[in-house]
Amino acid sequence: ETGLKTATEVANKDHVKLALEHDIDMLWIGARSTVSPFIIQEIADELEGTDKIVLVKNPVNPDLALWIGAIERLQRANIKNLGVIHRGFSTYEKTKYRNIPEWQLVIELQNKFPLLPLICDPSHITGKRDLIFDVSQTALDLNFDGLMIETHCTPDEAWSDAAQQVTPAQLVQIMKDLRIRKTSVAEEDYLSQLGTLRSHIDILDDQLLDLLKKRMEIAEEIGKLKKANNVA
């Protein structure tokens, strides 16, 4: 009715069969499937030789080898239109993100597969709609190829992940506010590399500030413990 492309997550060969039968345009493999070589192989066997777009989300935990292994299994299945989705990684620590970005791991993946399309999922990384823009801009500054942002007509009434969804109007505004570096062909490579390196520094600065914050919190706990035990 709309002419829009359709996409769905597949977690086993039966999902793949149904998706192909209904001519779904794009398939993605979720983070919890990426962790299992057995599931990935099952999906790869069913998709062998397909020209459908197939995207692989990073595994739940920050394990680059698992992510690479999943990509290589799908490559061996001669999947012609393969890409990856960065949705962040789970952590036991409390941070402002639902899933920490660990941008350095994605940069390593980019270096290994420079021609592989890379999509960022800021909705799952942030878990909060008010952080989506900043993470999206960081992804574009790191030369990501696209974004996967959750939208809902009435986000607060969504059955799942309500806090990380935006209205269509909010999505339009996010897209308008995002900036993509535009340069001449002669300058493009230099400025792209320079911008990426500067983004790397920004990421490291954020990590350092986060570590210092955690250090201060621990020092404060030590102070409270000493005070409670009357220790100078």
Task: List where the protein language model places each region.
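Generic detector of well-ordered alpha-helical packing
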Residues: V10, P122, T151, I203-D206
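C-terminal active-site "lid" helix and adjoining low-complexity regulatory extension at the edge
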Residues: P168-I180
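Glycine-rich, proline-tolerant flexible connector loops at the mouths of alpha/beta enzymes
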Residues: E1, H152-A163, I222-V231
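A structural motif corresponding to the C-terminal end of an alpha-helix
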Residues: T2-L4, K112-L116, L178-R181
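Extended, charge-rich alpha-helical interface modules
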Residues: L178-A232
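Receiver (REC) domain switch/active-site residues of two-component response regulators
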Residues: I24-D25, D145, D205
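Active-site beta->alpha loop and helix N-cap motifs at the rims of alpha/beta catalytic domains
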Residues: E1-Q41
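Catalytic alpha/beta core domains of metabolic enzymes, predominantly
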Residues: P37-Q170
